[in-house]
Amino acid sequence: MGKRLSENLSSLYIGAANKLKPRRSRRKIIAYVESYDDISFWRTLLSEYEDETRYFEVMLPSKTTLAKGKKSVLMNELGPQLGQNMIACVDSDYDYLLQGATHTSRYIINNKYVFHTYAYAIENYQCYAEALHEVCVMATLNDHPLIDFVAFMRMYSQIAYPLF
C-alpha cells in the first residue's frame, strides 16, 4: 500500500467513489492524457460515448509537475492503476506500427485501458486535406476559400511520393 494519496489513486479507488453516489448517478471515468492540447481532442471524442450511465473527466496526470508525454501517463505511476474507471489516452506515435517491438508498444497494444490514436498523433487527425480549410478558418476567422487544399495535397503527394 502506498504512503501517499496519489499512490493509491487507482481505477478501484474511482470505482469505490462512484459506489458512494446515488444508485442512478452516472459513473465517472477518469481519462488521463499527455498534454494540454490533447484534452480538447479526447474530450470531444469521448463525449460521444457518454450517456445516462457514464461520463468522462479528461485531465492531465499531474497538476503540479510539467511532465508531459506518454511516459508520464503510462509508465510512471498510472500504468498499473488503470482499469474500467481510469483510462489513459495517448498518441500512438510509432507504437501501433511497431506492434510490440518496444516495451511501450507492447504495453499500449496489450492494455485494454489504454486508448491511442491509430495515426502518429492527434495533429494527423486535425490536419488532413479535407479539414485544412476548417483549420484555416479557426486560425484566421476568415471563411473565404483561397486554396483548394484537397487538390493541392493530392498534387503535392503525387510529386513527393516517388522521392520516398
Over which residues does each language-model region extend?
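Acidic, divalent-metal-binding catalytic cores of TOPRIM
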Residues: 1-164
